[in-house]
Amino acid sequence: MTSTENNNNGSDETQTTKLHFEDADESMHDGDDNNADVADDITSADYYFDSYSHFGIHEEMLKDVVRTKSYQDVIYKNKFLIKDKIVLDVGAGTGILSLFCAKAGAAHVYAVECSQMADTAKEIVKSNGFSDVITVLKGKIEEIELPVPKVDVIISEWMGYFLLYENMLDTVLYARNKWLVDGGIVLPDKASLYVTAIEDAHYKDDKVEFWDDVYGFDMSCIKRRAITEPLVDTVDGNQIVTDSKLLKTMDISKMAAGDASFTAPFKLVAQRNDHIHALVAYFDVSFTMCHKKMGFSTGPKSRATHWKQTVLYLEDVLTICEGETITGSMTIAQNKKNPRDVDIKLSYSLNGQHCNISRTHFYKMR
């Protein structure tokens, strides 16, 4: 694997020994320390929107062919969903989805973007001759007012790492509840989160054991905190040891905001004899209102996307035999101090020929 992003978690054994990362008694919601909490309170929202003012992040997303071409295909191959409709593009960025909709015959598109990129989107819309069809509105969806009482279609690319990181989903649901006409559609309308297990000895050693000797100094006290940080990276499909299990499917057209916080059980069956160093989460997105169901996957056996996969390293190395099972549950919740962060509680057990263990780990995507 090649390193990319990070986040944060903690772990505790089921033998009641709890590790105190981020005040682990409330580790599903507490921050690392008081200074970090203050920084989060001051900068989290501003930093989030400011990050989308930079061209690099938009270049990465636009060059993600799986992502962008999927939306283009959905719109162009299913023009009946868009033609003569009023469309709301939530988190429009450069306005690419709005442009797709305008070209597909939308009556009007309202492109809402909170970052400074809104000004650039206006230029792009004008340069492409769609100023009469696309109106770019700069501001938060929760604060702006549309010039129309209702829209027929809401389209958004709201998904973050681990599907729910950055929590733009709540913004889409707010827009749906406020502006979507009865019988209107949300694109995409389904998103599913999955988990599997992988062998990853080389990278785990590089990420964790590295701290034992850093230029001749012992920094091993960092090891546990290092292992608590989920990694966003591309996983080789050959690393997968078990089958994959669905954690949750969310129906964006019907769900409530609170439904994005949940606990889901899982049972992973080993497909070969191997060692397990991490669990991996990924998601699929579906557009079920099309002539034929369309969508894409961010799984390790699919074409790579900028979302990659989210790797949750385990404190232990699990030795597993073909047919043995890892059972457990994953709890996912918004962080109370910064709702754009995601807190993860992972509990798992393996009762196998070579390994008998039960543990609970806490992670934070931040």
UniProtKB/Swiss-Prot annotation:
It is an enzyme of class 2 (transferase). One of its GO terms (biological process) is methylation. Residues 45-347 form the SAM-dependent MTase PRMT-type domain. Gene3D superfamilies: Hnrnp arginine n-methyltransferase1 (2.70.160.11), Vaccinia Virus protein VP39 (3.40.50.150). Its main location: nucleus. The keyword Transcription regulation applies. Keywords: Chromatin regulator, Cytoplasm, Methyltransferase, Nucleus, S-adenosyl-L-methionine, Transcription, Transcription regulation, Transferase. One of its GO terms (molecular function) is protein-arginine N-methyltransferase activity. One of its GO terms (cellular component) is cytoplasm. It is found in: Nucleus; Cytoplasm. Methylates (mono and asymmetric dimethylation) the guanidino nitrogens of arginyl residues present in a glycine and arginine-rich domain. Type I arginine methyltransferase active on both histones and non-histone proteins. Mediates the methylation of MED36A. Interacts with FIB2 and PRMT11. This is Probable protein arginine N-methyltransferase 1.2. It comes from Arabidopsis thaliana (Mouse-ear cress). The gene is PRMT12.
